[in-house]
């Protein structure tokens, strides 16, 4: 049954402060990363690092996601808008985050953290990779709740009508409700591409990466699998997702910026998986409790 999107993007209000679902999804993403990371730390999957060290790593990662995601969006998708008004960079509440920018931010943050703790960069990335997909899934759910980044038109029975899409933007909510009830808006149903990405980049990637990383793997393998899966899934979903308005299609009347940015991930993923065939395997080492270490 075709669904009319009517979710209030504001979860609740605390006096004059409005708490948006999108912000709550970010909190859920960081909490899931903390919970999963804690489990891996306690099982010794990043030797030499305890919970204090992991908390430090998570802080670095959070900064990388937020700063990289916002800057990346401005550079990749809204550069002209940014040049016209550079202060828009700080208006994060207006939306606009890029996964590829966030990934670059996380890579830089993890490199700095790994250097600080004298660890191999890819040992850190292999540890971090399984913590990311659930956060990606929560982010895509936030996109769906906010009624943004919708897909192309579809006749599928699970299509979604987005009231803020261009074809309905000039209609009043009451008009939209009445026309939807009469079945007059079915031709405006779109692919819920946000939910496709939540399923593929969130659920499927998490199950595959978490299961794969349960056993000690060769260096580069987990990171390579992450890059390969994300690049492939994102490239596929872009075929049913409307390209960002300021850019549109870049070539062939179908190639999008998201696909161009995903192709290097596929290539990097394949290279890392090939490198892992001759790389050492990082064996788990359980962290030493602080009290025991002090007694020594």
From Swiss-Prot:
The chain crosses the membrane at residues 10-30, 57-77, 92-112, 119-139, 194-214, 220-240, 254-274. Pathway: Protein modification; lipoprotein biosynthesis (diacylglyceryl transfer). Its EC number is 2.5.1.145. It comes from the Bacteria. One of its GO terms (molecular function) is phosphatidylglycerol-prolipoprotein diacylglyceryl transferase activity. NCBIfam families: lgt. Belongs to the Lgt family. This is Phosphatidylglycerol--prolipoprotein diacylglyceryl transferase. It comes from Xanthomonas axonopodis pv. citri (strain 306). The gene is lgt.
